[in-house]
UniProtKB/Swiss-Prot annotation:
Gene3D superfamilies listed in its UniProt record: 1.20.58.1520
Claim: Nucleus is one of the keywords in the record: no
Classification via InterPro entries: CCDC87
Family: Belongs to the CCDC87 family.
Organism encoding this protein: Homo sapiens
Pfam family membership, one: MAP65_ASE1
Coiled-coil parts of chain: 387-415
Keyword field contains Zinc: no
General function of this protein: Plays a role in spermatogenesis, where it is important for normal sperm head morphology. Also required for the acrosome reaction and thus normal male fertility.
Keywords linked to the UniProt accession: Coiled coil, Differentiation, Fertilization, Spermatogenesis
Name of the protein in question: Coiled-coil domain-containing protein 87
A biological process from GO: spermatogenesis
PANTHER family: COILED-COIL DOMAIN-CONTAINING PROTEIN 87 (PTHR16078:SF1)
Gene name, Swiss-Prot/TrEMBL: CCDC87
Amino acid sequence: MMEPPKPEPELQRFYHRLLRPLSLFPTRTTSPEPQKRPPQEGRILQSFPLAKLTVASLCSQVAKLLAGSGIAAGVPPEARLRLIKVILDELKCSWREPPAELSLSHKNNQKLRKRLEAYVLLSSEQLFLRYLHLLVTMSTPRGVFTESATLTRLAASLARDCTLFLTSPNVYRGLLADFQALLRAEQASGDVDKLHPVCPAGTFKLCPIPWPHSTGFAQVQCSNLNLNYLIQLSRPPEFLNEPGRMDPVKELKSIPRLKRKKPFHWLPSIGKKREIDISSSQMVSLPSYPVAPTSRASPSPFCPELRRGQSMPSLREGWRLADELGLPPLPSRPLTPLVLATESKPELTGLIVAEDLKQLIKKMKLEGTRYPPLDSGLPPLLGVVTRHPAAGHRLEELEKMLRNLQEEEASGQWDPQPPKSFPLHPQPVTITLKLRNEVVVQAAAVRVSDRNFLDSFHIEGAGALYNHLAGELDPKAIEKMDIDNFVGSTTREVYKELMSHVSSDHLHFDQGPLVEPAADKDWSTFLSSAFLRQEKQPQIINPELVGLYSQRANTLQSNTKKMPSLPSLQATKSWEKWSNKASLMNSWKTTLSVDDYFKYLTNHETDFLHVIFQMHEEEVPVEIVAPARESLEIQHPPPLLEDEEPDFVPGEWDWNTVLEHRLGAGKTPHLGEPHKILSLQKHLEQLWSVLEVPDKDQVDMTIKYSSKARLRQLPSLVNAWERALKPIQLREALLARLEWFEGQASNPNRFFKKTNLSSSHFLEENQVRSHLHRKLNLMESSLVSLLEEIELIFGEPVIFKGRPYLDKMKSDKVEMLYWLQQQRRVRHLVSALKDPHQSTLFRSSAASL
């Protein structure tokens, strides 16, 4: 008989038991659903006020929680109390209870308060455990800072983190936003799984540093905290569970088939060590899941055979949650799902701890051999600097020297003074030379003194090119060898001589006179515009060539003599010169030839450097013969006696001297007859009128020369002034002509006016101006010396219109041009006032002036 079929639930349990090891997710225990409260109970709760989160209640709860956390850590009690005090002080100073949210119900407000309380407790514990871990890891024997300094730094950092994660306004805003999101997800069906955090719960609680730890406790937060992580960690338990998984049978069917047509060819040179390095580098690159390998098995020896290909990498390798918590590993995945019963394997916790201890001891041995322990009690930082292995050789030498000195001092043979060496005899330095006829000679330097050098030195000399003592080379060969140096020295001498004639003060503009005198030559005759109205004449570059041909020389000399020197002679008729035009052209064509030119080049020097640098022979300058002038000898007045000389004060008249002369009995006048005094007075008045002397100066001269002592000097003064009067009148006449000419020719606006004048009009103006200036310069040279001599002899200058004429000569030309320009401006202003329509035009022209 056939057995009855088994019920379907038994088969499902059997298949589940077989496929459970193949699942990638651990089993989930279903939590019992909380019983729903009746709506009446919620209405009753709304009538009660919300429980307040006071500072005292929070501090008491946090203190109780932290007192039992991290007990396994090897930390002094003072350090634990210090960290707990920092957290409690931050809560006491900065905690503010948030108000009730109007948008939430009474029940939701209570949940929010519980959520906030849970967040504060959880965050305080996380911060406390993290800084306990940092205190343990940083307080090492080889640390640079002391334990107290390390604790102070960690306390300051903990206070900052407490401000960020406990009492900051961002904490409550983040909690409220997350709480409202959970409420919306709870109302919507199937959205609870979407709020699951990106990383699994408890990931950030674990330490990413590979085990074994020296802290003494397992669950320690040593990575950087995050506000979002702490907010997600404070969610209710139902939101922290993993999402529902698929049915194992459906999960098994969804696995795709493997493609084994293209197997992976593993190279034989890749060992297990290479795989471990690659896996460790991949794990370091993941910031959210820092893991480390847990397999402690010894590496297998290298096998040259090809390794088998794997369908997928093992996801169980690396640092896992079970390794952190010290739990036994999960059962290994079987090769076939047909496993009727699971084998129980012994726990490997003890083996892992033993291997950790072995590796710790091994590391301590390696560190001890690499860095020897310090014998002195110096701080670690100073010990590292002074006990570096590179300074070991120097320390050994110093210790050896110290031992020798101690031995000598103990034996009594130690002498504070070093042993004196015997004086050396002076020896000259000799050099051995071998001459051409194989004669060896020792040449010694001249010994200046008997001093000896304790430090000897040696200089290797280069071999000699030739020996002049043996006569290996004749003077001609030596001169040929030194021809390059000779040419260079000659060139330097030439340039030195040339540059000595170049002025080095050509850029010093302040050394010359402010006003350059006019040229003595008439440069207008040498301009190209001077030949516009004349026939074209051959230009002579080198006048020495003229002497080769008499006919051409005579012709050119006659032309140069006929050349006018003044612009008035340039307008003369040129019909007389046209008669010799035919003879000039014939001589010009027939006399010049190439042979004559080359003959001239061979007979004369072609170096023009002396012309460029002005090194030609100095020519005697042609002096312009000045017009005959009278001798400058002035009759000196009779000297004054000390008792006769009165004290003259300008503007004051000593009438005693006049009465003394007129009322004195039996006294004769100083000048003889009275008519001479009258004639002298008449001459003086004429001089005053011509020179336009002001009344004040006339009165001063009258007072000065009315005394009997000065009256004898008056005739000499009048004669001297009469001699200076004529040149002054001539100069004033020339200056008046120049003023009239500049009134017409110095207007700057004449260049912008349209006139019918030719282009040579401005050249003629320049010629007239230079002619007048030249005459003034010739006259001023003699007049200045005459006026200076008069002022030197008589002690007072010649006055013209109230000014000393010497001072007037220095600036009257510039003043003349200035007042001419001012007169033009006045005329423009007057014309602008008379014609208001053209006032704008005259304003622009006046501004340009």
